[in-house]
Amino acid sequence: MTAGVWAAVPVKEFAGAKQRLTPLLTPQQRQALAAAMLEDVLAALSEAPLAGIMVNTLDPLATELARHYGALVVTDSARDGHTCAVAAMARILAAEGREAMLTVPGDVPRVTAREIAAVIAARRPAPSLTIVPARDKRGSNAVLCSPPLVMPLSFGDDSFLPHLAAARARGIEPTIVKLPGIGLDIDQPDDVGALMRATPRMATRALNVIARGVATKQSPS
């Protein structure tokens, strides 16, 4: 275990999840995909060198999955969006005296414990910021803040460059780590295609849900 480094995972309620995937999957399949991706992420985190895992959610199934993998569940600002949910976890971890927070989204099913370890290994002495960009180099898919409140985070489709600029404005040169698993978040139909084509092939729970969903869409009525 790495003392003081906690994973922080914000999870929206699964009902109505992943609306942008409507052309590919039914509402029920999108909910199943959200749950499968979260479990893929939690499984990787549970095997990584972390002091603990915190999940911020109000979803009953997400709560059940989090507890199954030994995560601490909180609900502060859980319905206020990704940014507010992460900020709430950062405040909690800072108040508890934790050394660092590694925030990871719940929709990166190809993440591995080895990738998480690589992010942790790349961090510099505090104050520091380590960031893994999305594959399009626009989003911030994982951010390691040391200490947890080293700077405010603001997530969205174009958060990567603003996070770099914000760190530098505070005199912190961010460490950038490019990782294919963490870099592939599943939000758009082309992300699904990228997941299905990705090599080496991983038998993720998310891929199984997608394969079944696409097969159902393509089968004759």
Where on the chain are the PLM-derived regions?
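A short, N-terminal amphipathic alpha-helix
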Residues: A34-L50
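Acidic donor-binding segment of Leloir-type glycosyltransferases
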Residues: L50-L72
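Short phosphate-binding loop-to-helix
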Residues: R67-A100
